[in-house]
């Protein structure tokens, strides 16, 4: 089994075990190991695989799934300019604190700045607009990588051979676990007047519908919401 196959399988298996169900894939050449791993996982009914050819649209599609589910949604692309198409969705995920996981395939580090076909400097490409940025050619512990919120970038270096014939059943014995839930900071609000209104912005700031309704009822205030509760 090649190092690229090992890296792809470890990454996808860990994400499945962390309870991630939806994956958005834009197929390409360098991310072929990830594509094969995802198709195999989908064939076993372990994930929901959404294929979108356009990377910009794929990233916003993943953003929408994350907003609906509250879970991290990986969006996967090949190397080169494909990665740059994620930036608009990354900005929105950053400012809205949406859990978007960017899995970008890359060539090995030794080919950077050499004039080799298609490499660009993908590591750190999203700057301060991601809450974590990782550049690796070997498997890493994703439970710590995703112990946060908002967009996270993992740049995966895949070397040749990208595809090998291997019939190993690498998806047996899946042990599901959950990502740790973030604790919200609580505060006490005492209205100074009886004429109050509760305005709920986009994404509810992470609060559950029941929490919002309970708070509004406790102060006798009407609710004005941007989205349906």
Regions picked out by a protein language model, each given a short descriptive name:
Residues 2-229:
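N-terminal alpha/beta PP-like core and its mobile active-site loop of ThDP/TPP-dependent enzymes
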């Amino acid at each position: 089994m090649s190092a690229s196959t090992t890296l792809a399988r470890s990454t996808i298996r860990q994400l499945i075990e962390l309870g991630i169900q939806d994956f958005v894939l834009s197929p390409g050449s360098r991310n072929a190991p990830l594509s094969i791993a995802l198709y195999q996982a989908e064939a076993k009914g372990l994930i929901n695989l959404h294929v979108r050819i356009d990377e910009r649209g794929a990233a916003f599609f993943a953003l929408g799934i994350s907003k609906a589910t509250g879970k991290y949604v990986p969006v996967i692309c090949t190397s080169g300019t494909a990665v740059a198409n994620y930036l608009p969705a990354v900005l929105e995920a950053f400012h809205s604190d949406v859990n978007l996981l960017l899995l970008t395939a890359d060539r090995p580090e030794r080919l950077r700045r050499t004039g080799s076909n298609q490499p660009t400097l993908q590591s750190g490409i999203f700057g301060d607009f991601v809450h974590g940025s990782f550049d690796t050619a070997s498997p890493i512990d994703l439970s710590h990588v995703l112990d946060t919120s908002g967009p996270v970038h993992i740049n995966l270096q895949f070397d040749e051979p990208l595809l090998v014939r291997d019939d190993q059943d690498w998806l047996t014995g899946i042990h599901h676990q959950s990502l740790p839930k973030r604790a919200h900071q609580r505060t006490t609000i005492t209205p100074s007047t009886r004429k109050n209104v509760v305005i709920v912005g986009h994404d509810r700031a992470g609060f559950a519908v029941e929490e919002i309704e309970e708070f509004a009822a406790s102060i006798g205030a009407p609710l004005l919401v941007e989205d349906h509760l």
